[in-house]
């Protein structure tokens, strides 16, 4: 029964935030229910106004006499009931006190409320009911369809989601939204809250907020209507206290109580809300996420609720916010909302699944949705009567909420006798009944009256604007939805940014350490360069490396930005700050992190290598390096901000980085650039920096000559005028090369460009900064589609192809075709009846937390018998899942004691395989279909002795039994594009049943987060399995009384893993109730939910206290003694049973290793085929960069610079390596997490089969990619022309292809080796990048073995790229004549009286140079090389070593594979030894 409003508002804790400027005074609690209700009761408007005035007067008198007058709770904490940090804190008293103070000065604290009315509300989207799955072969058809859609010729179908909704919610009221998943609950809430991203509203839609239009509310007053989604997204590095303090500060009003600073206000509000929601103990705990340990899941949910609460919106839309909370905490949350609405006049619209009667009774109104139709709107207390009068029946103990939702499920609604042909059946019939009802007519009249009372643009809007304006800080625009000014937003985001930095220093520290190591390595390679012409190339290479590493230091910022983007978008919707304010602050926050990285790296690099050691030149070097880092940081951030998904950003970014590298001006000098790509050099900021660094190093400097031409025997006494220095820019007769001339001749660089370039760089910096800030403010992430099923092409069932205009993308296939329960039982006969009994005694489980032993389970006893369904319940954190994991033998750490026996015998290796474990998370391979997932489980987990045909037949039985025929061919996909929540849960159960478990099934929270109908269907399914001989142990929280009736026994745990009860439940749970009542608990009320009553009895419900220690009561009870006795008896009797023969000879696994390998390999091949985005991203990296490199180095001549360019073209081809590695790692990690979390504990297959299949699947694809990479790179550069002189064009072409193939295979196996033992792909990518850089530095291109210090020679030998580059260069250019370009020809005047031939013949013969004009007697022209082999010898490459190198490369590939398997075993395979030792100890 619903409590009267006054009682309800004072029942339990008053636990919700009050915005001091939101809502009417406290009297709202005593005002009448609604306009509609009053008119219905015959009270006229005039009379109502009088009653309201009277109530307000009485309320004010009661406040004045409350004894809290004048006490400011923000400053005065003398009253412990007003101090949120006190145990005696009373939130109701705090609320009353605050409202009393603010109501005395209505001018300073104007109030605002926002009720809502809606008429003709129609929302729709575009899409299809079912889509076909993209594969490598059919993705082109999708692309064609997308192009047609782009030009307006697509077959986009309008899908109506909400149809003709009508209703109104007054300020101070609460509306509950009921409907099954897919009925449009979320869409309705989003529409009211203005979150229509990807949705459209019909033109006639009329939504008003007490005189404010929909458009104005969601622009000027954005953040005043809030939508709180199901998901929890927060910065994991922040503590819960800091997260909430940020929200409190962002919405802290300007019109605070006198003497209260903004910080005092925010801190106090934060403390109050945390106290109200029971979060005070998490104040200094990190929020965390899946990867970072932090608060628990339920606490994280409450942090989200607290954040929304602190924003103080007058209208709040809560979407399934109780998901993951136990029933008592969920009730407490709804009561808190009730208090907020009663005291402050705020309005709450709440979609809730599995609403208990106590929760339902808190609400004023209810709206019931059925596949996008409204079938009821009105008072919550009248809804049940409305449908019972229609002809439906509500079973005893079924909650009103469950009854209303069950009406929308054909299999679950019950019709009263005699009404079978009178009740509506389809959604349209229900909607028609509602439209023709008297209740609707009354509702329309009430909406009319509501809108007349609050006309658009009337006084209510003025009042609202005034209240909002009073809160805003100075310098805030009148039309701005934000409370703070722009500068204050930046300051606030800055504070949070530094807290995030402090919370996770690992990234900064690892970057500083990593860059320092890299600087030391590079500096040691180029250690103390001499100041002769020999160091020219080395200095250029060093500066090239330095500027690239500075430029690309910020590339990973793209990833960080994408991780925080959903959080920033959420806060923007809450109107906490501009996204651009966060963008600016994140740039500033990163500066202190960038500074140490930059200083350490550049200092080491500059001074160790003997670059120009003067303060001025170092300053110029550092200035350009830092400016380049900042410019490129903005460019990468801009790319991330512009792209609407991370995948969209990755391939373009890597190609963009490669373009920047090539067109910096070192790998291909400006004079050699082809006109079609020359422009890329102009728009490359790094090119300007590189030019300035070269000018800074070489300009105004003379380098002594290291080698003269001619030199050697006979030339020692030749005059200097007849010699020339060997190098570009040399002049005969000079014993040095002038730096300025070298820059001009070799690079076309001029000293006058030094500061011009800095100006251009600043231009790039400013432009990219503005572009990033603008993009971050304007570009939104991609909206998700509505829920649709995806099928393999050609297998879309006929019913799914028909897209009706009524179809609902939230769940188009809400299955009206569900069969009646009795028809399904025919298929259950296939289930194997279990005979074994699983029993355990005195089970304890201890783990170490921060060096302290902590007991998770404390002497737990129990058993599960075939044909029984046992519930495992407990308070949050009681160790329910831990007990399930310990019993299922899935624990890999900690100390376990006690006995866990099957028929009196210890569990053997096959135990995990013989049990099914239905996990809470529905983890499945996204690309597989439902049938394939079941077949995979059946093939691997059923005994090898069972024929394949029999296994497949059993899968069909499972599909029928679980009613999955309609979507058996559907692809699992991701939520929204694939199976919905219920279908996923059924598949999770199906996968375990398909394995034919011999012993029992464990279920972990199978109903968590489901609506009551889905929860009921899952419980009915478990009951059905049990009735056919299965044994099931199932953890459950938030169960309704009806759900609990499905269970036979209960094991209840209190905090610390102590048993409170283990035994039968009895009919209507009488046995359980009797146990507690006999032991002195209060009586259970007749209509109460016994599960919730029990939580209150043992003190687990918030606000309840136990009058005795119930675990102690159990310990000394007669019932426990009986349990102990029965366990002892079982142990003795069951041992007498004959032991069944072993069904499989493979112990741990059902199938032999070779069979496991082939089944796994088939699945991963299928997965890759169905991931066209991955395969085509790989193809793009193997086509676009090679093609680009090919056309950049188009038809290189065999000049000295030409050969160097060809060498760099190989070097640049290697640069695609890290991108290919990065692409592969997330796919491996996805497969691995599925294996480790679900398939390994189930003993489906061995880790060896998993690893080998994951390595082998990559090889064919990479071999295929070698083909385009080879053709796009080898032929445009023209390397094949070098084979003409030796007449080996075909042979060398084939060998080159082999080398490209080896490179691709090496890439593939190297990726597997790097990710094998490492958790996160990002970490593995970073380590792979470091190792790649090392291989590249020591491969002999940037620094030849002659230049390398002796210490590093071993690295040159160890680097696989040394052999790869050596082989590719040898095959590409060996044996061809060299033709010097004009700037490479040396001009030497012969001594008087000698011609060129006579003077230089001895030298050219000895040095194998070419004399171009032997007969001339002046200006002798010498090309210092005659064949390409001389160039190769200079970098220690011999053609004769080609096949030795190929052999060594194959050894590397084998090594990578073996290392991948070994590392996986070493790091990730649980070692049983550790656990056994722990047990012994």
Curated annotation (Swiss-Prot):
Q: Which InterPro entries match?
A: AAA+_ATPase, ABC2_TM, ABC_trans_N, ABC_transporter-like_ATP-bd, ABC_transporter-like_CS, ABCG_dom, ABCG_PDR_1, ABCG_PDR_2
Q: Which UniProt keywords apply?
A: ATP-binding, Cell membrane, Glycoprotein, Membrane, Nucleotide-binding, Repeat, Transmembrane, Transmembrane helix, Transport
Q: Which residues cross the membrane?
A: 507-527, 542-562, 587-607, 616-636, 650-670, 758-778, 1174-1194, 1210-1230, 1249-1269, 1298-1318, 1327-1347, 1358-1378, 1446-1466
**Phenotype of null mutants:** Does not significantly affect miconazole susceptibility.
Q: List the disulfide bonds.
A: none
Can you tell me which residues the record assigns to a coiled coil? none
Q: One GO CC term of this entry?
A: plasma membrane
Q: What induces it?
A: Expression is slightly up-regulated in the presence of miconazole.
Which Pfam families does this one have?
ABC2_membrane (PF01061), ABC2_membrane_7 (PF19055), ABC_tran (PF00005), ABC_trans_N (PF14510), PDR_CDR (PF06422)
Glycosites? 19, 76, 320, 530, 1395
Give the membrane topology: Multi-pass membrane protein
Q: Does the keyword GTP-binding apply?
A: no
User: Which residue intervals make up region (Disordered)?
Assistant: 1-45, 61-89
Where ATP binds, per the record, is at: 874-881
Where found in the cell? Cell membrane
- Name all ABC transporter domain ranges: 134-396, 838-1081
Q: Which family does it belong to?
A: Belongs to the ABC transporter superfamily. ABCG family. PDR (TC 3.A.1.205) subfamily.
- Task of the protein: Pleiotropic ABC efflux transporter involved in the basal level of azole susceptibility.
Protein name, please?
ABC multidrug transporter atrH
């Amino acid at each position: 029964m619903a409590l009267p409003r006054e009682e309800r508002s004072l029942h339990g804790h008053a636990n919700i935030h009050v915005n001091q400027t939101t809502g009417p005074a406290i009297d709202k609690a005593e005002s009448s229910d609604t306009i509609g209700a009053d008119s219905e009761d015959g009270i006229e408007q005039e009379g109502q106004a009088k009653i309201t005035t009277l109530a307000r007067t009485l309320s004010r008198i009661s406040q004045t006499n409350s004894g809290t007058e004048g006490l400011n709770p923000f400053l005065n904490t003398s009253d412990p009931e007003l101090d949120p940090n006190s145990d005696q804190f009373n939130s109701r008293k705090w609320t009353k006190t605050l409202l009393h103070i603010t109501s005395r000065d209505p001018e300073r604290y104007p109030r605002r409320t926002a009720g809502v009315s809606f008429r003709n509300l129609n929302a729709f989207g575009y899409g299809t009911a079912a889509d076909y799955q993209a594969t490598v072969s059919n993705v082109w058809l999708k692309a064609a369809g997308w192009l047609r859609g782009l030009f307006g010729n697509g077959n986009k179908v309008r899908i109506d989601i909400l149809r003709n909704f009508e209703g109104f919610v007054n300020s101070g009221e609460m509306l509950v939204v009921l409907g099954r998943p897919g009925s449009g609950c979320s869409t309705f809430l989003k529409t009211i809250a203005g979150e229509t991203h990807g949705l459209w509203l019909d033109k006639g839609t009329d939504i008003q907020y007490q005189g404010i239009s929909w458009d104005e509310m969601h622009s000027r007053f954005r953040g005043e209507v809030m939508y709180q989604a199901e998901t929890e997204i927060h910065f994991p590095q922040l503590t819960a206290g800091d997260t909430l303090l940020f929200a409190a500060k962002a919405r802290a009003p300007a019109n605070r109580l006198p003497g209260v600073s903004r910080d005092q206000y925010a801190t106090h509000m934060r403390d109050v809300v945390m106290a109200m929601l029971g979060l005070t103990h998490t104040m200094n705990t990190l929020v965390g996420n899946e990867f970072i340990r932090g608060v628990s899941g339920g606490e994280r949910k409450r942090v989200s609720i607290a954040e929304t609460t602190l924003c103080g919106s007058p209208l709040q839309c809560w979407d399934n916010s109780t998901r993951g909370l136990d029933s008592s905490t969920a009730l407490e949350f709804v009561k808190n909302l009730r208090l907020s609405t009663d005291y402050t006049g705020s309005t709450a619209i709440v979609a809730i699944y599995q609403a208990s009667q106590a929760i339902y009774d808190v609400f004023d109104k209810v709206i019931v949705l059925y596949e996008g139709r409204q079938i009821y709107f009105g008072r919550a207390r009248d809804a049940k009567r409305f449908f019972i009068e229609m002809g439906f029946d509500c079973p005893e103990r079924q909650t009103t909420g469950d009854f209303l939702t069950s009406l929308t499920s054909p299999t679950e609604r019950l019709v009263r006798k005699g009404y079978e042909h009178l009740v509506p059946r389809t959604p349209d019939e229900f909607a028609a009944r509602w439209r023709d009802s008297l209740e609707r007519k009354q509702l329309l009249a009430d909406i009319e009256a509501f809108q007349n009372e609050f006309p658009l643009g009337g006084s209510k809007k003025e009042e609202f604007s005034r209240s909002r304006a009073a809160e805003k800080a100075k310098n805030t625009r009148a039309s701005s939805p934000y409370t703070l000014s722009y500068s204050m937003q930046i300051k606030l985001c800055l504070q949070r940014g530094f807290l995030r930095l402090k919370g996770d220093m690992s990234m900064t520290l690892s970057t500083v350490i990593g860059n320092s190591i890299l600087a030391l390595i590079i500096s040691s390679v180029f250690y103390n360069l001499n100041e002769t012409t020999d160091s020219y190339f080395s200095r250029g290479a060093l500066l090239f490396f330095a500027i690239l590493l500075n430029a690309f230091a910020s590339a990973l910022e793209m990833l960080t930005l994408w991780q925080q983007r959903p959080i920033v978008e959420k806060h923007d919707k809450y109107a906490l700050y501009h996204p651009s304010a966060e963008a600016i602050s994140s740039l500033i926050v990163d500066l202190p992190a960038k500074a140490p990285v930059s200083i350490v790296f550049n200092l080491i690099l500059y001074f160790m290598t003997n670059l120009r050691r003067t303060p001025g030149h170092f300053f110029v070097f550092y200035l350009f390096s830092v400016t380049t880092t900042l410019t490129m940081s903005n460019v990468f951030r801009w790319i991330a901000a512009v792209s609407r998904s991370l995948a969209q950003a990755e391939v373009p970014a890597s190609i963009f980085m490669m373009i920047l590298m090539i067109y910096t001006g070192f790998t291909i000098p400006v004079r050699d650039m082809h006109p079609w790509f020359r422009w890329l050099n102009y728009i490359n900021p790094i090119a300007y920096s590189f030019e300035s660094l070269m000018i800074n190093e070489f300009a105004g400097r003379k380098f002594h000559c290291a080698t003269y031409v001619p030199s050697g025997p006979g030339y020692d006494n030749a005059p200097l005028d007849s010699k020339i220095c060997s190098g570009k820019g040399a002049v005969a007769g000079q014993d040095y090369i002038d730096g300025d001339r070298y820059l001009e001749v070799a690079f076309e660089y001029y000293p006058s460009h030094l500061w011009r370039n800095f100006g251009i760089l600043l231009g790039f910096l400013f432009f990219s900064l503005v572009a990033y800030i603008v993009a971050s403010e304007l570009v939104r992430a991609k909206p998700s589609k509505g829920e649709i099923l995806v099928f393999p092409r050609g297998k879309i069932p006929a019913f799914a192809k028909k897209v009706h205009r009524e179809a609902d993308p939230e769940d188009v296939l809400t299955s009206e075709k569900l069969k009646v329960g009795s028809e399904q039982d025919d298929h259950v006969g296939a289930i194997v009846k279990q005979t074994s009994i699983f029993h355990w005694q005195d089970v304890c489980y201890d783990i170490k937390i921060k060096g302290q032993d902590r007991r998770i389970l404390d002497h737990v006893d129990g058993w599960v018998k075939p044909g029984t369904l046992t519930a495992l319940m407990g308070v949050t954190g009681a160790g329910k899942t831990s007990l399930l994991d310990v019993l299922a033998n899935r624990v890999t750490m900690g100390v376990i004691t006690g006995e866990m026996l099957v028929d009196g015998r210890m569990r053997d290796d096959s135990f995990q395989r013989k049990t099914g474990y239905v996990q809470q998370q529905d983890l499945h391979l996204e690309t597989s279909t439902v049938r394939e997932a079941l077949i995979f489980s059946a093939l691997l987990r059923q005994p090898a002795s069972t024929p394949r045909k029999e296994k497949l037949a059993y899968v069909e039985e499972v599909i029928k039994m679980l009613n999955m025929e309609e979507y058996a061919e559907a692809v699992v996909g991701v939520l929204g594009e694939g199976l919905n929540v219920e279908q996923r849960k059924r598949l999770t159960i199906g996968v375990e049943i398909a394995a034919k478990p011999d012993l029992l099934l464990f279920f972990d929270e199978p109903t968590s987060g489901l609506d009551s109908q889905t929860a009921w269907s899952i419980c009915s399914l478990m009951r059905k399995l049990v009735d056919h001989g299965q044994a099931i142990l199932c953890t459950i929280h938030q169960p309704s009384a009806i759900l609990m009736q499905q269970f036979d026994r209960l094991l209840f745990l209190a905090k610390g893993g102590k048993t409170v009860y283990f035994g039968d439940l009895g009919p209507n749970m009488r046995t359980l109730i009797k146990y507690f009542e006999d032991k002195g608990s209060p009586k259970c009320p007749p209509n109460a939910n016994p599960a919730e009553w029990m939580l209150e009895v043992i003190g687990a419900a918030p606000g309840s206290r136990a009058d005795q220690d119930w675990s102690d009561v159990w310990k000394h009870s007669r019932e426990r003694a009986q349990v102990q006795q029965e366990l002892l008896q079982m142990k003795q009797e069951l041992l007498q049973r004959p032991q069944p023969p072993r069904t499989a000879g493979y112990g741990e696994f059902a199938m032999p290793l070779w069979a496991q390998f082939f089944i796994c390999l088939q699945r991963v091949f299928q997965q890759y085929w169905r991931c066209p985005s991955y395969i085509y991203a790989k193809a793009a990296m193997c086509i676009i960069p090679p093609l680009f490199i090919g056309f950049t180095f188009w038809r290189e001549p065999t000049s000295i610079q030409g050969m160097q360019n060809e060498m760099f073209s190989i070097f640049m081809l290697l640069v695609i390596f890290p991108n290919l590695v990065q692409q592969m790692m997330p796919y491996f990690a996805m497969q691995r997490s599925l294996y480790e979390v679900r398939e390994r504990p189930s003993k489906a297959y061995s880790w060896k089969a998993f690893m080998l299949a994951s390595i082998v699947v990559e090889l064919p694809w990479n071999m295929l990619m070698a083909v385009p990479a080879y053709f796009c790179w080898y032929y445009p550069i023209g390397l094949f022309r070098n084979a003409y002189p030796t007449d080996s064009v075909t042979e060398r072409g084939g060998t080159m292809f082999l080398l490209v193939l080896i490179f691709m295979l090496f890439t593939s196996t190297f990726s597997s080796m790097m990710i094998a033992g490492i958790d996160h792909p990002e970490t593995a990518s970073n380590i792979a990048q470091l190792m790649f850089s090392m291989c590249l530095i020591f491969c002999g291109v940037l620094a030849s073995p002659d230049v390398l210090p002796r210490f590093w020679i071993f690295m040159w030998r160890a680097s696989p790229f040394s052999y790869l580059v050596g082989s590719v260069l040898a095959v590409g250019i060996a044996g061809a004549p060299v033709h010097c370009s004009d700037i490479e020809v040396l001009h030497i005047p012969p001594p008087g009286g000698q011609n060129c031939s006579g003077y230089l013949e001895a030298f050219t013969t000895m040095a194998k140079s070419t004399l171009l004009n032997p007969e001339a007697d002046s200006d002798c022209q010498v090309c210092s090389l005659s064949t390409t082999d001389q160039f190769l010898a200079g970098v220690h490459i011999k053609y004769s070593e080609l096949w030795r190198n190929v052999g060594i490369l194959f050894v590397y590939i084998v090594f990578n594979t073996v290392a991948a398997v070994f590392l996986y075993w070493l790091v990730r395979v649980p070692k049983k030894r550790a656990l056994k030792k722990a047990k012994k100890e």
